[in-house]
Amino acid sequence: MKGLTRLLNSLSRHTASVTCSPSSSSLLISRRSLFISAATHFPVNFSESITTNASRNCSRSSSFPFNWIEQRRTMFIQTQSTPNPSSLMFSPGKPVMEIGSADFPNSRSAMSSPLAKAIFAIDGVVRVFYGSDFVTVTKSDDVTWDILKPDIFAVVMDFYSSGQPLFLDSQATAAKDTAIHEDDSETVAMIKELLETRIRPSVQDDGGDIEYCGFDTETGIVKLRMQGACSGCPSSSVTLKSGIENMLMHYVSEVKGVEQEFDGEEEGTSSGPME
């Protein structure tokens, strides 16, 4: 896990680390053809299905006498594994989120984004996450990536070729959870600054993100929600304890621990006031 490893290396006194060797595969998708890198192996019907879909959307002029001259649109899509085997990062080679990130834990939450909505329409997709230059897709356990990848590649390619906005409401999703307010205590401000500048970039390297949910002033517990590939990841508890918790406790003496919030968990269940 390269993000967590980088986070742990910044604390020389802590030796716990989690490693993951991400592997990537590259696809060069054209409106007329699909080129797959030699390092990636897919079933024979993989290229056929994407080529057919790409060719169907190809804009051609039947009146032009030479059918070998036509407009082509090419996109280079790269995939990268994450610490969560059920999540995969798709990098379209261009910015996705200009500011912040966006998490879609279900299809209902994706109604405001045409791309996320289209990805959720693929059978087997259970979560979508937007990062700065990648889209993380999480699948259910009963489907394989060999089946899902062709459809996801086609959806991403069609979206960026269409020119549609990422969000229908045209409002950028900024990282508001770590925005420092005037009424924030010095402790909360320090926690937010560390999350935004030191921890969040490392977590995003692994295809996920974190959301600040509050700080319990009585117990010293920081509440965080894991997003994207980090949500449901087998290594998420290690990320919290060995990486995030150690760093927050090292720089902010008031922090005594970190606990994870889960989707759908009721607010206000903590024993003390949350800031």
Curated annotation (Swiss-Prot):
GO biological process terms, alphabetically, are: iron-sulfur cluster assembly
Q: Which InterPro entries match?
A: FSCA_dom_sf, Nfu/NifU_N, Nfu/NifU_N_sf, NFU1-like, NIF_FeS_clus_asmbl_NifU_C
Does this UniProt record's set of keywords contain Mitochondrion? yes
- GO molecular function list: ATP binding; copper ion binding; iron ion binding; iron-sulfur cluster binding; structural molecule activity
Transit peptide feature range: 1-61
**SUPFAM superfamilies per the UniProt record, alphabetical:** Fe-S cluster assembly (FSCA) domain-like, Hypothetical protein SAV1430
Q: Which domain of life is it from?
A: Eukaryota
Provide the Gene Ontology terms for cellular component: mitochondrion; nucleus
Keyword annotations of the record: Mitochondrion, Transit peptide
Where can this protein be found?
Mitochondrion
Q: What does this protein do?
A: Molecular scaffold for [Fe-S] cluster assembly of mitochondrial iron-sulfur proteins.
Q: Which family does it belong to?
A: Belongs to the NifU family.
Cited PANTHER family: IRON-SULFUR CLUSTER SCAFFOLD PROTEIN NFU-RELATED (PTHR11178), NIFU-LIKE PROTEIN 5, MITOCHONDRIAL (PTHR11178:SF43)
UniProt protein name = NifU-like protein 5, mitochondrial
Please report the organism this UniProt entry assigns to the protein: Arabidopsis thaliana (Mouse-ear cress)
